[in-house]
Each structure stands twice: as structure tokens, then as C-alpha cells.
């Protein structure tokens, strides 16, 4: 009967508009929900089957809710470093629990990017869903996204990130060495010619200074030693001979063979003088050390002569440890180092003007006590050479190498491997002291890459800058998420460490997803399966840090929908009342 179908059509209109009202109400209620996607009710006709000759029967209307999940919401700035929004396609991957995840655990997808740290340090949004991503390798620190393997995703946790320290591996020095720096006495040889006096200053045990004239003579030897060159030696102070003797050199090796010094008022002493022959021709010799008595002639007095610079026995490192020993450097550069534990060490580059106009002796040393096997802290020694225009002869090198000098300090407790004879056991390399308990450290010292590098000009010796990497120990102060989805830990020593990368899931039909509690969605047959991607890769949207995606609800549109829905509902109710009145009239016929 057509009247009955009209009444049923009115009922369907009430139902459809009730559904539309529900969708509008849901939209209005979530106008401030982060990442909420509005929905609407679409109406479609219902047709009663029949032919054209039959009386028309109303079919009514059907409402179907449609979600605009793929619609982009406006981006709103926030003050939280953990707030993120997606600009473009994709969803955050989340789980309901943070740990012990398996492939069968349900994954939810959301655009709600307001995350906070829970009590265990996991990133969780306001709905209690845990953010998933690719974690950094604990050893290398590298993050390698693998979109093909769901189990590579894990809940992002920053609670396990402790303090950090990075050891120094590179050093750049910018300094100038004075080109007219006088050659130190410990470097210059005291040269004398046979028959001519050579001045030698010595200090006795009572710190009395004596100035001796040493005269060599190649004549007057009655019984010269076969194969050797012998010289008579006269040692005078203030014109008075205090000792006489002779020295003999091997003609082939130029090494001192023997020396006999006759002190006035004392018995002769054999082998108490050390000299070095400079010229193999036999006319020029050098007196480096004198083991002689003081001017009074007392044979039990101790006299110490000035020694020549020798990095292995009489070095600048020795002087740094004990000022009464070794050779005082002409210039030093302090280089700060961070060890593997974040401890702050200092390596000193000491330099001594060499005998050549463009030559300097150099030593690298640690603080005495920082090394286990070198009491004076010496690490490395060598020579620095410059060109005539004041540049390093070998660009970037320290000791004449063609590349930046590398020093290696072995770890605390290092034990050198033994070799099998006849192989010779190499010297033990510099090693950190056992008490420090720190790792091996290799440091590249570059003297050219730093601005200006190391130069030798006729101006004051000065350090312009020393640049190093590495940091002291630092505590975690902040967490940030950048445009690439990298979650980074920031420490108070200036170090930033990436700990994870946020994963983005995309769908071929995101509007086919099924909504669940917490402003999240689940996979359906209509949506298709998801594809994991890094932000801004493969069609995935980019992340916007410190922002949130606003709800896509437009209140003006929703209120307009309320009016039309209310009118439609009222009109549908009129259909029912009208049909009812017509049926009433039909019943009145019988009266």
C-alpha cells in the first residue's frame, strides 16, 4: 500500500537524518581534537522493485557515513619539542604496549602527534599509544631504516640514554714561531779548532759557575794509538791550567776511544770526559760534557757541565717534569684532549729552535703520571721544518710526514705482544696509566688545515687558536625531533646524539581505514596494507617539529549542516504524521 510505504519512507528519513546528526555532533565535539578527521553522512535512495503499471511505493533513503581521513588539517605551532605533525600523506605507527612486541601485536595508525615521555622514557601520545621507529645501533650509532621488516620497528625510548663523552680524534693548531729565535745553548755545539781555545761553562755542586778554556793540540804525542787520532787537551780557568790530558778518536767511526785527564793536585782520572768529534778531517772537535773537579783542585768535588739536547736522555719533557733537568723549550702549545670517559687531558707541543734557520725540534708530551710507561709523559719527538717563505715544508705535517701526524696512546692496562727471537721486541708505545682505565686514543694533529696553520715568521711566537673535536662528559638536557623524523638527545656538553627515526605508514586508500578509540585507525581490506617509509621518502609526508595538526572540522559548515539536518528530520516526521492522518481518514469511512 502506498500510504504505508510513505510512512516507512518517512521513518527512513528520520533514521538517515539521525545518522547525519550523529556525524555532525561527533565533528563538533572533536573540533579541538588533535589530528581529528571530520566525517559526513552521504544519502542514497532506496527503490522498491515494481513495474511501471503498478502503484508507486516509496523506497525511502539510506545514510552512509564517509570519513575524510586523507584531508590535511591546519598546522598549529606549540612550545613542546616532542610535538610533531605530518605535512602530507602518512600516519604515525603506534602500539598499545611499549615492550615485548611481536608480529601479531596490533598496530594502530594516527595523525595525533602530541607525544610525552612516560615513566619509563617511552614516547606516548595522549591516547596512550606508543610511537614506533627505527632505533640507532648501540655501537655505531647509525640508523638504518628497513621498510620491509615490521619487526625492525620498536618503541622509541629515551629513558635509557645516559651521559655521553666523545674522545678527541682531531687537532688543528694555528700558531707562529719566531723565525729569529736564538738557537738554544743546548742545541748549539761548542766548536774549537786545534790550537785555539773553546769556551765551556760548567757549574759545580756548590752552584759555582766556571768558565774554562779548552785547547786541543794535534802535535806532541809521543806514542799515538794505531789507527786513532789523538789530541792533547789543556783546560784553563782565568789563564791557570787546572787540568791536562789527551783524548783519542777512532779514525773510522769518529767515536771517542779514550780520554785521560790529569787534574792539578789530584790523581789522573781515565774516561771522565766525553767529547764528540765534529769533522772527520781531524781539525774540529766538540766538548759536550766535562767531568772535572772545581777550580780548587779538590778531587772529590762534583762539577756538572751543560748537556746537549737529546730527546731520549735530555729532553724538553724532562724539563717539564723537573726544571733542574732537561732542556727548557723556546715555545709551547697546550692542546686539550677529551679521553674516552670524558676526562680532560692536556697534551703539550714543545718546540726548541734547531741549529738550522728553518728547523725546530718538537716534542709531544702528556702530563707526567698520565702515561704508564713514560715517566716524563713523552709521546713523540721529531723535527719541524719550514720553507724560506715561512710555511711548513711538508704541508700539514708535524715531524716531516706527508700527512697529518697521528699519535696513538694505548688503552690503560695495555700489554705489548711478545715476539719470538731472533725478532727484536719493539719498544712499548705510549700507554694511558692503569689507574685512568680509559680506551686507546688516536689523534690526528694537523698543522695546516686550521686557519693559518703553523708558520715561522719574524714576529712574536704566539698561539692563535687550537681546534679540537671531542667533548667532556655531558648530561642529557633535552629531546628533539627534526624534519627528518630523527629523535635526538641533547647533552649539556654540546653533543647531539640521534637515538631513533620516526616511521611513517602510507596507504593506497587511507579513507578506507577503520577508526578506533584514541583518534587512531586500523587496517581494513578497503584501505589496503600499509607501507613503511622514512619521512619525506617515497611519497610520505614531511614532519614539522613543535607543531600539531588541527582538527579538520569547520564549525560554520557543521552548524549549517545542523540546520539542514533538523529541517530534513522535521520534514520526515511530517511524512509520518500526514500518512497517519490519511490512514485515519480511511478508518473514518467505516463509521
Curated annotation (Swiss-Prot):
SUPFAM superfamilies: Flagellar hook protein flgE. Keywords: Bacterial flagellum. It is found in: Bacterial flagellum basal body. One of its GO terms (cellular component) is cytosol. One of its GO terms (biological process) is bacterial-type flagellum-dependent swarming motility. InterPro entries: Flag_bb_rod_N, Flagellar_basal_body_rod, Flagellar_basal_body_rod_CS, Flagellar_FlgE/F/G, Flg_bb/hook_C_dom, FlgE/F/G-like, FlgE_D2, FlgE_third. NCBIfam families: flgE_Caulobact (NF040922), FlgEFG_subfam (TIGR03506). PANTHER family: FLAGELLAR HOOK PROTEIN FLGE, FLAGELLAR PROTEIN. Belongs to the flagella basal body rod proteins family. This is Flagellar hook protein FlgE. It comes from Caulobacter vibrioides (strain ATCC 19089 / CIP 103742 / CB 15) (Caulobacter crescentus).
Amino acid at each position: 500500500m502506498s500510504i504505508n510505504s510513505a510512512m516507512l519512507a518517512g521513518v527512513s528519513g528520520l533514521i538517515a537524518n539521525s545518522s547525519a546528526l550523529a556525524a555532525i555532533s561527533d565533528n563538533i565535539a572533536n573540533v579541538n581534537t588533535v589530528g581529528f578527521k571530520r566525517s559526513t553522512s552521504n544519502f542514497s535512495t532506496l527503490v522498491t522493485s515494481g513495474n511501471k503499471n503498478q502503484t508507486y511505493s516509496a523506497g525511502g533513503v539510506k545514510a552512509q557515513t564517509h570519513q575524510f581521513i586523507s584531508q590535511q588539517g591546519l598546522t598549529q605551532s606549540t612550545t613542546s619539542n616532542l610535538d610533531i605533525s605530518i605535512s602530507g600523506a602518512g600516519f604515525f605507527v603506534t602500539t598499545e604496549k611499549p615492550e615485548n612486541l611481536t608480529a601479531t601485536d596490533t598496530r594502530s595508525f594516527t595523525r595525533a602527534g602530541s607525544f610525552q615521555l612516560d615513566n619509563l622514557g617511552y614516547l606516548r601520545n595522549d591516547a596512550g599509544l606508543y610511537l614506533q621507529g627505527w632505533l640507532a645501533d648501540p655501537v655505531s650509532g647509525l640508523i638504518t631504516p628497513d621498510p620491509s621488516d615490521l619487526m625492525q620497528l620498536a618503541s622509541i625510548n629515551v629513558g635509557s640514554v645516559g651521559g655521553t663523552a666523545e674522545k678527541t680524534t682531531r687537532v688543528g693548531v694555528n700558531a707562529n714561531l719566531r723565525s729569529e729565535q736564538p738557537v738554544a745553548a743546548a742545541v748549539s755545539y761548542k766548536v774549537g779548532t786545534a790550537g785555539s781555545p773553546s769556551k765551556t761553562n760548567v757549574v759545580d755542586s756548590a752552584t759555582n759557575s766556571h768558565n774554562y778554556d779548552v785547547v786541543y793540540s794535534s802535535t806532541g804525542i809521543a806514542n799515538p794509538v794505531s789507527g786513532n787520532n789523538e789530541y792533547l787537551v789543556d783546560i784553563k780557568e782565568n789563564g791557570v791550567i787546572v787540568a791536562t790530558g789527551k783524548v783519542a778518536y777512532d779514525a773510522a767511526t769518529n767515536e771517542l776511544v779514550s780520554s785521560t785527564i790529569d787534574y792539578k793536585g789530584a790523581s789522573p782520572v781515565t774516561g771522565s770526559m766525553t767529547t764528540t768529534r765534529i769533522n772527520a778531517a781531524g781539525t774540529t772537535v766538540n766538548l759536550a760534557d766535562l767531568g772535572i773537579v772545581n777550580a780548587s783542585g779538590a778531587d772529590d768535588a762534583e762539577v756538572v757541565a751543560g748537556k746537549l739536547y737529546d730527546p731520549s736522555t735530555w729532553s724538553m719533557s724532562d724539563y717539564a717534569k723537573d726544571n733542574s733537568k732537561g732542556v727548557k723549550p723556546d715555545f709551547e702549545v697546550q692542546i686539550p684532549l677529551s679521553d674516552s670517559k670524558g676526562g680532560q687531558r692536556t697534551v703539550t707541543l714543545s718546540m726548541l729552535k734547531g741549529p738550522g734557520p728553518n728547523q725546530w725540534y718538537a716534542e709531544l708530551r702528556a702530563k707526567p703520571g698520565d702515561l704508564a710507561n713514560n715517566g716524563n709523559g713523552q709521546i713523540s719527538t721529531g723535527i719541524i721544518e719550514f720553507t724560506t717563505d715561512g710555511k711548513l715544508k711538508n704541508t700539514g705535517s708535524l715531524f716531516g710526514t706527508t700527512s697529518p701526524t697521528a699519535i696513538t696512546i694505548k688503552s690503560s692496562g695495555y700489554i705489548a705482544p711478545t715476539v719470538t727471537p731472533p725478532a727484536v721486541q719493539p719498544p712499548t708505545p705510549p700507554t694511558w696509566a692503569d689507574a685512568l682505565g680509559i680506551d686507546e686514543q688516536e689523534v690526528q694533529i694537523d698543522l695546516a688545515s686550521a686557519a693559518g696553520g703553523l708558520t715561522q715568521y719574524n714576529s712574536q711566537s704566539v698561539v692563535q687558536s687550537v681546534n679540537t673535536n671531542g667533548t667532556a662528559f655531558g648530561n642529557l638536557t633535552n629531546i628533539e625531533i627534526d624534519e627528518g623524523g630523527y629523535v635526538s638527545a641533547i647533552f649539556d656538553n654540546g653533543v647531539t646524539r640521534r637515538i631513533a627515526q620516526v616511521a611513517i605508514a602510507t596507504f593506497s586508500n587511507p579513507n578506507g581505514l577503520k577508526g578506533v578509540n584514541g583518534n587512531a585507525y586500523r587496517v581494513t581490506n578497503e584501505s589496503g596494507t600499509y607501507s613503511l617509509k622514512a619521512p619525506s621518502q617515497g611519497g610520505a609526508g614531511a614532519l614539522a617539529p613543535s607543531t600539531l595538526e588541527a582538527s579538520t572540522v569547520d564549525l560554520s559548515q557543521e552548524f549549517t549542516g545542523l540546520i539542514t539536518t533538523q529541517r530534513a528530520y522535521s520534514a520526515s516526521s511530517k511524512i509520518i504524521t500526514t500518512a497517519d492522518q490519511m490512514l485515519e481518514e480511511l478508518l473514518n469511512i467505516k463509521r
